[in-house]
Amino acid sequence: MTTRKLFALLALAAAIGLFVPALPAPAEAKAFTVGIPLPLTGAEAKFGEMEKQAYEMAVDEINAKGGVNGVKLALDIQDSGGKPETATAIVEKFITINKYPIVVGEYTSQCSYAVAGVCEKYNVPYLVVTGAADKITQQGWKNVFRLNPPASLYNLGVFSFFEQVARPKTIAILYENTDFGNSTSKAMKDYCDSHGVYVVLSEGYQAGAVDFKPILQKVKSLRPDIVYMVSYLMDASLLMRQSKELDINPQAFIGGGAGHTLPEFLQNAAEASEYCMSATLWTPQVKYPGAKEFFDNFKKKFNKEADYHGAEAYAAAYVLADTLKRSKAATSDDLRASLAGTDMMTAFGPVKFVSWGQFTNQNKMDTLVLQVVGKKYETVWPSTAASAKFVYPVPRWRERK
């Protein structure tokens, strides 16, 4: 019996009040499979690997407890290489050949936006998990739901830190020329323009550059209070190493999430990562139910730490399970309706899809500020969520031990 038929029979039985002992036992039912494109190779592979592991860990937990309505979950994870055209082809196959009624995942904003367009075309619901460019949920698409905040809201915690602690007068903004980089840096520039923080430099760069010294020399000559960067892992690491080499000394280096929050950033940037701050959506110190357990179990299982990207993927699997549990049938129409009614707490935080302004089916949540203190990440803002006291202004490079 197919999963779709099984859900339909269960719904019919519930509707007419019948007890149906003759339904197949869970072991006889086929698993419900969800398609997930992810970058498992290429520049974003570290993010894709973490998310893949988090999805799999969550599904193992769900299945160990009997699955969803007695039906096990299965994942069909395919490597997009971080390329929108590849992600599009994968999802076309998911929908037209595999007949999957829902799609979850991807990592970059470009790939997520491309996948969203395909899902809207075929009227199949799509749960965005990490793609952050504002435009993804600004198209009025009825099939696209986003778990993570839009890029323009990533810095809410940083803005609060500026207003209550740092009170900077000048800032330099460096960002990669991607959808995520453009959206996040624009939000920072707009905030600064409206709050009296003078933007001495706002400059994009090609992701994957091998030398940032020309742009960093500009930053050094302008001597801003804050150096703000939106970068993926390798760029974030190189920017910090070369900032140290050039002896650039702002009151703080602050990342816009992404590469500045990965555990590998601490390794790659080494001593240059110390005291670096970043916007983040989640840390293991948050008080959400299951957050610390997820972090500890992930570290035990994979011998490495998860950041907010892993927490997003882990939570997305539970959102999927909740959606299936409440759905009348495993069809795209029913799953879309069920997804729209989501209102739950996860290890990543609250999930409820709402519409406001230009956003449609968008989750809302608070954001945080972390800082590398003593060679490890600590939550430093807001103070109510802090695991350590922030260091601001940061010591000059030559004053550090």
Can you name each region flagged by the protein language model?
Residues 2-19, 23-401:
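Extracytosolic ligand-binding ectodomains
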